[in-house]
């Protein structure tokens, strides 16, 4: 259900803008996208889990806010991130 520490480190390594980067919007969006993907898979088996669905909506909203921020600050980084993650927009 949740992502492991190893998977988080992989994502940080892949999307980091500098060595040791853990808080850039790219890293945060990548980790949120992984959590969203895991929850989406969870809902295939547990269709009536509305408490988790509310959490999913919060994660999607948080990711959207970070993407809007990144687009406002640096459109090139935004476009690169969207392509890497395969998000629609």
From Swiss-Prot:
It comes from the Bacteria. Pfam families: Ribosomal_S15. One of its GO terms (molecular function) is rRNA binding. Coiled coil: none annotated. GO terms for biological process: translation. One of its GO terms (cellular component) is cytosolic small ribosomal subunit. InterPro entries: Ribosomal_uS15, Ribosomal_uS15_bac-type, uS15_NS1_RNA-bd_sf. Gene3D superfamilies: 6.10.250.3130, S15/NS1, RNA-binding (1.10.287.10). One of the primary rRNA binding proteins, it binds directly to 16S rRNA where it helps nucleate assembly of the platform of the 30S subunit by binding and bridging several RNA helices of the 16S rRNA. Belongs to the universal ribosomal protein uS15 family. Part of the 30S ribosomal subunit. Forms a bridge to the 50S subunit in the 70S ribosome, contacting the 23S rRNA. PANTHER family: RIBOSOMAL PROTEIN S15, BACTERIAL AND ORGANELLAR (PTHR23321), SMALL RIBOSOMAL SUBUNIT PROTEIN US15M (PTHR23321:SF26). This is Small ribosomal subunit protein uS15.
């Amino acid at each position: 259900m949740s992502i492991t520490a190893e998977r988080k480190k992989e994502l940080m390594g892949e999307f980091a803008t500098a060595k040791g980067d853990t808080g850039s919007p790219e890293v945060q969006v990548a980790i949120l996208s992984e959590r969203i993907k895991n929850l989406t898979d969870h809902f295939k088996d547990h269709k009536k889990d509305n408490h988790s669905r509310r959490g999913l909506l919060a994660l999607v909203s948080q990711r959207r806010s970070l993407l809007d921020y990144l687009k406002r600050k640096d459109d090139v980084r935004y476009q690169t991130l969207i392509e890497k993650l395969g998000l629609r927009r």
